[in-house]
Amino acid sequence: MFPYVTLAKDKSWQPGPYDGVELLVLHKNETTGGVTILRKFREGLTVPAHIHPLANEYAYVLSGEWEESGAVYTTGAFFFAPKGVKHGPHHAKTEVISLTVFDGPLTVQ
């Protein structure tokens, strides 16, 4: 049996770092501060360009469609943003849900 199991249906969505972004924490590594989360972006939301100074970001789009720098990402897209590298702005063309892993504390600048 796995040492840690959780069900998303047993968790609650929490406010994210921007209005219109919600987070559902599936797991937090108490040693590194890293998190595995579901992220929900409200349709029409634009998240400004930003960096994550303390963590690499790995994201897989579960549903929805968003645009960044003229590229459109849809269900099945995977992307990686290295720690400290500016990315965005992101525009949610529809509601977007992603499975995202930050390998260190989730901070935004």
PLM segments and residue spans:
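Glycine- and acidic-residue-biased ligand/ion/polar-headgroup-sensing regions
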Residues: E43, H52-E68, T75
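Histidine-centered metal-chelating micro-motifs
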Residues: T46-P48, E67, F79, K83-G88
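Glyoxalase I/VOC metalloenzyme domain signal
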Residues: L7-D10, E43, P105
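Ligand-binding loop in jelly-roll beta-barrel domains
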Residues: V21, A55, Y73, K83-V108
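Catalytic core of non-heme Fe(II) oxygenases with the double-stranded beta-helix
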Residues: Y18-H27, G34-T36, E43-A49, E57
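A short, N-terminal "cap"/entry segment at the start of jelly-roll beta-barrel domains
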Residues: M1-G33
